[in-house]
Each structure stands twice: as C-alpha cells, then as structure tokens.
Amino acid sequence: MLPTARKLVFSEVPIVDLGPAWRDDAGRAEVADAIAAAAGTVGFFYVRNHGLAEQDVRDIFQTAVDFHSLPLEAKMEVSLKLNDHAQGYLHGMTKGNDANIKENLQEAFQIRRPLADDDPDLLAGKPLHGRIPWPSAMPDLKPRMMAYYDKINGLGYRLLELFELSLGLAAGTLKASFAKDMNSLRLLHYPPQRPDESGEHLGARGHTDTNAFTILAQDANGGLEVRNRDGEWVAVPPVEGTLVVNVGEVLKVWTDGVFTSAVHRVINRSGNERYSIPFFMYPSFDAWIQPLIRNPDPANVAPEDLPTSFPRDRPFVYGELKARNVARIMPQKSVA
C-alpha cells in the first residue's frame, strides 16, 4: 500500500524484516507495506532475513580484497577504458566526458549479466552489451563473482515482486521491464580519507542511482550517507546481518515520484580500507520507462536537480538514457 503521508525529513534509515514475506501472503503484504513506507519517505532501508548466508557475504568481500590487492598493471589489463560497454576495472581518480564531474576516491571492478557468445545484441555491438573482461592474474575471479551474482540476483527479483505488491500492481508488471536485464555487480574499494574530511574529497560524490534499485553489502567501516529534504547528511552505518536497499531513478519514475530516489555519498573517515559490494537492478536496454501510477501528492516530490534525474513527464527508452549517463561519468574506449 502506498504511504498516505510522507515526511522527507528523516534522521535515520529504517530496517525492514523480510522474514514474514517468505512465510505467507499476509506476511508478504505486511512487508510490502513496510517497503512502501520506507521507499516513500527515505528512499533507503535496511533488510534483514534477506536469505543470503553470512558466508556468501564474507566470501564476496574477500573476493573484493583479493582483486584490489592485485598489482595495478594486472587490473589495468581489464580497464573499462579498453572497451565501450563499461565493464571491467575503474581506476581511482578517473572520470567520463563531463568536465564538471570531479573525481571520486575509489576504484572498482564491475560486471553485468553475462551474455552468450552468439547473443545478437553482443554481436551487433549494441551499447552496454559486451563480453566481461576477466583478469588473467586472478583466474578464480569469475566463479567467485558469479556465485554471489546468482544469489544476489535472485534476491533482487524477490524484492522486485515485493515492490510490485507495495504499489498494488499486478504480478509481473515490473518484471516485464527486465526481460533482458542489465543487472550489475560491482566490487568497490575506498582508500582511507582524513577523519576531519568535510566533503571536498569524497569516495563517492552526491548522486542518485540510475536503476530501479540497488542492494548493497557494506563492510564494518561505515561512510555511506543519505541526504534528507533539509539537506542534512544522515549516516547509514553498517548493521550486522543486514543489506541496504535504495530506490533508484527508475522506481521514482514508475511511481511518479511517490518513491524517492535519495541523493547519497561516501566519505571514508574510518582510517581503514573500505569495501562495499553494490548490486544494481537495471531494466532491459529497450524497456520503455514511464509512470505506472499517478502521484496523489505531486507537490511532495524531491527536487529533480541532478544530471542523474530521469524525466517523469514523457516515456523514454531506458538504455538510451543509461548509455548517455555512463558516457558522462565513466571513461570509455576512445573512438576515432
């Protein structure tokens, strides 16, 4: 059920227990209501009893540590600068074609849903469709990442069903836009920053996510912050046994702004190396995105003042906007 009253000034991020959703229909309805309340006020929420084993989460963090411990030349072998589909290694302090974007203090390795060798979109060179570049120096990276990918992807689709229920939509309504999803897994590493860092140098600058929603595993170091309507940065500290879910621009459009895609950032003041593992639920490239419900309170929508904001006043092909956004923020292979 959609939230009837929304207070976009918040001081903490709520926790949603998914356990009842795996029990029966009444539990699913209870959880869907809790998700709607969190998505319509904060745009961020923790989930517990999510179904991923603690060992699976520990394993993917160790995978991230092992990859980012490789020599730089081994990582640069799979630099996303060497391809035009934005998969591979993103070196810290690099950026895309927008001169106004400042560098982030991070490095990452990212993949999307693997494509078959005879995939027609891959063979046609369709934007954002390409083979994953795996580093030769870490031959077990592929099986380790794919083991986690398959499990977190399953959770993503279970959450998608709960979002459908929370909006009163028929089962499969949102899933139809994921017929050939571009879901993405990223291994992020943030070097330590000064404890008194005020915001000039950031691990990740304030942004919204250009997907449906994100499922984040974060380590014990903290640093993630979400901005409320008063412009205050609210900490999203690690909570044992939970994952963090945040609403992206696509869900904001689908709900006509009822669900809020909150601006968030990362400042690693811990003094330690910080790792986080986001999983992005991306619709199919060719999915048409437009509001699926009407906002009963259109005046109570967060301002759309970021380059990452998606339009709600006209339908659009998801992949076209996503490809333009990727070109803005990420380095890509030079085209003569």
Where in the sequence are the language-model features?
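Peripheral, non-catalytic segments flanking oxidoreductase cores
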Residues: 1-336
